[in-house]
Amino acid sequence: MYKVLAGVGSIVRTLWMVFTHITRKRDTILYPEVPAEEIVPPRYRGRIVLTRDPDGEERCVACNLCAVACPVGCISLQKAEKEDGRWYPEFFRINFSRCIFCGMCEEACPTTAIQMTPDFELGEYVRQDLVYEKENLLISGPGKYPDYNFYRVAGMAIDGKEKGQAQKESAPIDVRSLLP
């Protein structure tokens, strides 16, 4: 008789727990149905992109600091030079199968050309598809820093302006006049 009462009590307790948990909010997130904005934290470091400056030209000056800062060596690029003396990457390649999304390349970039986006859907069936070229990485906008232009701040001569006339640039200093 005790075993029968214990069995019935166990069944009643189980049903009670099931019906009380049915109305609770789920802990598991159903990813495809839930928008990505609700899943990804605000400072999530996802896919890497190359941005353009406000004038529409690519920001990357092929300084190679991102490749040096990368702890796993997944970034490779080759420098080329335009007629006006501006450097640009002839090719820029990131192997996302090796990337650990640490953000060191973004911190090392002096022109803010490399930026991390909250995009996390990078799954591919073929490993070679995880190697992104410059054409895949380059976006049409300036990204997080819409007003920043490296060449306005860096002091490179701009067509139509003399040295010292660019934005936030002081006039050149004559060092000889400072000597005694």
UniProtKB/Swiss-Prot annotation:
It catalyses: a quinone + NADH + 5 H(+)(in) = a quinol + NAD(+) + 4 H(+)(out). GO terms for biological process: aerobic respiration. Its main location: membrane. [4Fe-4S] cluster 2 binds at C70, C99, C102, C105. It is found in: Cell inner membrane. Residues 50-80, 90-119 form the 4Fe-4S ferredoxin-type domain. One of its GO terms (cellular component) is plasma membrane. [4Fe-4S] cluster 1 binds at C60, C63, C66, C109. Keywords: 4Fe-4S, Cell inner membrane, Cell membrane, Iron, Iron-sulfur, Membrane, Metal-binding, NAD, Quinone, Repeat, Translocase, Ubiquinone. Its cofactor is [4Fe-4S] cluster. Belongs to the complex I 23 kDa subunit family. PANTHER family: NADH DEHYDROGENASE [UBIQUINONE] IRON-SULFUR PROTEIN 8, MITOCHONDRIAL (PTHR10849:SF20), NADH DEHYDROGENASE UBIQUINONE IRON-SULFUR PROTEIN 8, MITOCHONDRIAL (PTHR10849). NDH-1 is composed of 14 different subunits. Subunits NuoA, H, J, K, L, M, N constitute the membrane sector of the complex. This is NADH-quinone oxidoreductase subunit I. The gene is nuoI.
